[in-house]
Amino acid sequence: MRPTVAAPESATWAVHLDRAMWVAGVRALMLQALHPVAMQGVWQRSDFRVDPTGRLLRTAHFVAVTTYGSPEEADRLGAHIRRVHAALAFTDPATGRRHRVDERDLLVWVHCAEVASYLETAVRAGVPLTPAECDRYLDEQSATAAYVGLSRDDVPRSVADMRRYLAAVRPALRATPEARRAVRFLLWPAVPEHLSALAPLRPLWFPVGALSYAVLPAWARREYGVLPEVPGQEAAATAALRLLRAGLEAVPERYYNLVFDEATVRSAEQARERLLAAGYRVENGFRALRSRTRFRAPDGAHAAARA
């Protein structure tokens, strides 16, 4: 049995364990909001309006568990998500049509907006990924789609396939009033009572939110029109992203982990024990395992990673 859903030598590990994921995660939520029907599902059937921070942390927990959680842990989380989604429906005010939250097209959009954002942000931030590794990341993430009720063939499994999908769905995307409000929430989120310990860090969030907005595709920023466009913005955003990544990478793991909820931290601690038992050197933390020269994989680990 694999110690983690994704092996440390996987492309998934290289992307998801990078600290640029904070920007990638917020970018993903901003991109997802441009699908008018999907946005109505979030607006009507979630607590996003009162707890956008919680939504981000739940997404981080899902990414964590489906990366370094045990296969059994990820299966349990996926089953829970599918049960919740199966019970939820909403009405599109533009058409009056009722929709289920777990409709295939909506699930595909959410998946693609997430993993495309994760990959594109990682590459832009300077994560060293070859074109083959980028394709492998999307192929690996097609397996993750099963946790929300999709099959691997429902979603793009290469960069070329992802580009074709995003081009095909682009005409249906637009910034509704709800989407613009969602982006403003993400730029300056409220801190709910159960996360009050993070309140002192709120002023530090705006640069992260603004950078997440800045690394959206240009067409998406034009749709929103929430922040002004400036000359040289693309190059400046890339430079700022790389600077932020370097700063976050310098934060010791014990302090960095304070921003995650208890369940996510507990999952990481359990993963550390399983990896140690499997022969991985984890004394320098999970991030050290991303470098192929800094971990010792047990016999057969590469075969398991391909399975």
Residue spans for each PLM region:
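Mature, function-bearing regions of proteins
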Residues: 1-307
